[in-house]
């Protein structure tokens, strides 16, 4: 598990494994902290319009968004399957957007 990997996760594991409970996310935790039992992730979606707190991406041929306004911490047991990694240009754009989002 490393930064910018895209994973299928269980959103709410306490409610069981149902299809509606699954989602895509990208890991945003710096690799130096990935030994911890939980990771910081940003959910991914194909169904939300473009707004400033969303980063556009194409993953597995689908246009979508990374929702940096919906970041959350997920226990590692909620990670089901690694699906790939974000393209380099999306990684750069995501980091730039985080700097803007959390600017003081």
Indicate residue ranges for each PLM-predicted region:
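Conserved functional hotspots at enzyme active or ligand-binding sites that engage polyanionic ligands
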Residues: 1-104
